[in-house]
Each structure stands twice: as C-alpha cells, then as structure tokens.
Amino acid sequence: MAKERWGVAHIYSSENNTIIHITDITGAETIAVGSGGMVVNADRLEGSPTAAILAAKRAAALAKERGITGLHIKVRAPGGHNGPWIPGPGASAAIKTLAREGLKIGIIEDVTPTPHDGCRRKGGKRGRRV
C-alpha cells in the first residue's frame, strides 16, 4: 500500500467569496488553489455553496493529481475587530465536497482571527443608531 501524503486545506469563507488553498503539511508550498470567482461568471454568485462545491472539486482534483491522500482543514471567516466571526455559506459545502472527492479528512480547525480588545469598533460612543 502506498504511503499516505497529507496536506492542509485553508478554507477562507466570507459572504462574498470562498477560497480553498491546499498546501503541504508545513504550509510553505502551494499544491492547489480554487475560489468561487474562478468557477462562476457573476460576482453575486461567488459566495454561494454551489461555487464553493465547484472550487473544492477543482482544488481536490489538482491535489490528488499531485499525490495528496488526506487533508487537515483550517476554516477561516473574515474576523478581526470589524468582520463577522462566522464563516460564509460556502465553508461547509467545501468541506463536504473535499470528503466526497475521496480525500481523507483529519483535523477540522477554526482559525478565524479574534480581537483581544485591540482596536475600537467604529460607531462612536453610543453605537450605530439604525
């Protein structure tokens, strides 16, 4: 039986786009990249689960071609002191697709940047009044 070769799938998912970046285990060498904008024509569809599925299929095919058999997954939302800390609609669709394409899934980890009370949010003393 051939030796397993693991990689890391960095999935960045916002409301507007989903980017799947597969690297080697160290994160230094890029193996495959796919994004919503690479597979759909309309800008409004880039963040959809359908675009994430197509991007994940494309990235998985390139990764399997280069000998990757399993993936550890790192999911990231925009985060920071301004953005949402919840991944967009394409994140779960991308993970499911990578599993369906025959790649083994190891660890699924959330790596969204969270503020530790650094910058002040915009909106003033009394907050945003709607």
Curated annotation (Swiss-Prot):
One GO cellular component term: ribosome
InterPro entries linked to this entry: Ribosomal_uS11 (IPR001971), Ribosomal_uS11_archaeal (IPR019961), Ribosomal_uS11_sf (IPR036967)
One GO BP: translation
An example molecular function term from Gene Ontology annotations: structural constituent of ribosome
Pfam families: Ribosomal_S11
Keywords: Ribonucleoprotein, Ribosomal protein, RNA-binding, rRNA-binding
Family: Belongs to the universal ribosomal protein uS11 family.
Subunit record text: Part of the 30S ribosomal subunit.
Function: Located on the platform of the 30S subunit.
HAMAP family: Ribosomal_uS11
PANTHER family: 40S RIBOSOMAL PROTEIN S14/30S RIBOSOMAL PROTEIN S11
Protein name, as recorded: Small ribosomal subunit protein uS11
Origin species: Nanoarchaeum equitans (strain Kin4-M)
